[in-house]
Amino acid sequence: NGAVAATALAARGAKVALVDKGDFAGFTSQNSSNLVWGGIKYMETFEFPLVRQLCMSRNHLLRSYPSSIKEIRFFTNLEKGFRFPPFMLYCGALLYWAIGNFFTRPPRFLIPRQINNVESVINTEHSIGGFEYSDAFLYDNDARFVFNFIRSAISYNCTAVNYIESLGSVRNEQGEWKTQLSNTKNGETFEVRSSVIINACGPYVDQQNQVSNQTTEHRHVYSKGIHLVVPQITNNERVLTFFADDGRLFFAIPMGGRTMVGTTDTRVSSPETEVTEEDRQFVLDNINKRLNLDKPLSETDIISERCGVRPLVIKSGEKNNTNEEWMKLSRKHAVDVDCEKKHISIFGGKLTDCLNVGEEICEAVQQLGIHLPDEKRKWYGEPPEAIRNEYLNQVDLMGLDKLTSSGASEVLSTRLWRRYGAQAIGLLENIREDPEMAKPLIEGTDYIRCELTQAARREMIVTLEDFLRRRSKL
């Protein structure tokens, strides 16, 4: 939310400062499933306007970021005793496709034999059929996608800093906000002044508002979700979709040479969470029941874990005590605007809807009297076609793709453009000067040496985790 808000406002002429207590995308975003989807699960609760909005947002992202966001098939197996018959869910998938303006490939009905023929790794012993439909995913990861927004914001003269914590904001008699900031690495404190405050602290929006004595119409409740990264389950580029023992959607998501399995949905009271033994066992039990593996997955197969919270939006006075009320909560976002104090809070939301959040914040800021001189300027999307053509021309002239290592998952030209956009042209110059810069940094990975130099110079890395976990896919 903060990254798109900063990019949209800076691109349209506002003077913007973006402050992050940790690293950019270092909390909820880095723990996401990397899926860009239209909310098919909300079909069951008849939230068709939300599904329509999310489908349109998904389509918009697919058009705007063709290198970074790709359509992917979701392959769904249903078992005996499921609450709906397969053909009914297939009809729902057809409706989902129609709600999304038929933008993706059409759904397909599957009988157990077809499921077994296409994905023999799926246990079809209790299968009653299934279906296949399309949504989208981030080819790299959520954290990298967010950082590319940060990079765009900086190119529009936004001041963006990580590892700087807000200690709270107060508004003086002249109507100006004063925010105390602290460097979390050396303890240095300083003050910044602004006409408007935008609280885009994700799961910590409520806590930040308390520090600044700000009351709002909405608040957050939290759902913990975990994913386990395990050795590759299938080399087919599709998401395997099941319904877990608790009835929720459950995925096995391709992740390069690995597979990410999850997720859980556990009500928690704080954004600070961790993976428990119960979480691990739930995921392992569910995936092992639904796959035909030579050897069941165990804790020794876990390469890494992801654990984060979904900030769910409710009215400030609501309780949502029952499980039924809890399960009906969606990932809709809300923007609270305090016109008197010139304060904005962004609650909830998901990656799929990020461009809408940026547009809504621009409208809200104008509502507060801030002039945006370039209010119609497009602030998102990949670089113009002319820049891409120049990049590809240089790629051809230097024979870049011939330098791609034998174990790479894609050619260098595709990878560098997706990750760096127009800045990839500078990487070509580095490789021309020294072809060794096109060699893998670590054998078995796609990351090449010139990218390390790029990261050190231009990607605001403070800790090794920033590089390993969020800027690269190592």
Place the predicted regions along the sequence by residue.
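Glycine-rich FAD pyrophosphate-binding loop
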Residues: 10-31
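Gly/Ala-rich phosphate-binding loop of Rossmann-like dinucleotide-binding domains
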Residues: 6, 10-11, 152
